[in-house]
Amino acid sequence: MSPGTQFVISGKPVLREALALLVQGDDFFSGAVNVVTDPQQTALAGFGAIAIAQARGLLEPAAIQVQ
Amino acid sequence: MNILTIDTGTTNTRVFAWRDGEVIAHSARQVGVRDTAITGSRHTLETGVQTAIQETLHHAGLGTDQVDLVLASGMITSNMGLHEVPHLLAPAGMGELAAAMVAAPIPAIWHQPVWLVPGVRNRVDHIGLHNVEAMDMMRGEEVESMALVKRLNICEPAVIVLPGSHSKFVSLDGAQRITGCVTTLAGELLQVITHNTILASSLDSGFADEIDREMLLAGARSAKQIGLGRACFSVRTLDQFTVYDRNA
């Protein structure tokens, strides 16, 4: 992990804000901090499982779209 | 194409029905592998997952014969779940996870094989006190990480932070493979400290409604310098002798 590694922070709004501030206030990390929005983390596990199943060839490409 | 996805954790199970990439119904039950650990039986978990599936199908207006694929991830693949699948060794990305999927018969919840996504563990051998800090594992966060890779188009090395009862920090390399993770008890500690310690009074048994940047960073600095236990007691001291409150 390098100082420029980007952070992607999910979770409840107040936790996302707190964690983002902690990373931004850290002396080691200087990379981008991306805070995930609520729509971006909707049904995350299912979306990921479908994406992996698609990579396995279990469903046609049209069954999943990037949101 | 109609798909059901099952996400079973330690205490909760969530089932979603999808059609053409969109959620059309969902249901959640407060049942997870903790029930298996407590009762010594899988019956509660099986019943809870099956009920969540039936509720989701009902909300979606689907019959069992209209579902083309059932996918499951999370603690359902653990030794306390419904079908154990060994962890995949990091590094593991979309391709490795896809190749390691297992179609398992779990007749207690579904009449056809359920496709299970394995968890991922750090690549550490001969684990002992000397290297336990390097070891860690996940079941469920790997699918969430791959979802964020796809939704956010992550294409550079990254750390994905997934706060929860057991907060995960998932490390990705430039090829979007999971190279490892670090887990903390942060969520559980926050819950216990807020509700079941002397600080419950100072905190009104709740988390801050808004973040005060100065106080947040001061707290983090304090915990780093003098330890979490002492830093926590400072909250009571500030409550007793200053004007600060839960929101600082």
Where are the regions that the model predicts?
Chain B
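Short beta-strand-loop/turn "lid" adjacent to the catalytic site in phosphate-handling enzymes
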Residues: A60-M135, G174
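Short glycine-rich, Thr/Ser-proximal phosphate-binding strand/loop in the N-terminal lobe
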Residues: I3-T44
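Glycine-rich phosphate-binding loop plus the immediately following alpha-helix
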Residues: R34-S41, N122-S222
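Secondary-structure boundary elements
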Residues: D20, H58-D65, K150-V159
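Short, well-ordered amphipathic alpha-helical segments that serve as non-catalytic structural scaffolds
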Residues: L45-A60
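ATP-binding/phosphotransfer module of carbohydrate and carboxylate kinases, centering on a glycine-rich
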Residues: W18, E22-I24, T197-A248
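A short acidic Gly-Thr/Ser loop motif
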Residues: I6-N12, M75, V161-H166, A186
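Short glycine-aspartate micro-motif
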Residues: I3-D7, V67-L71, A158-L162
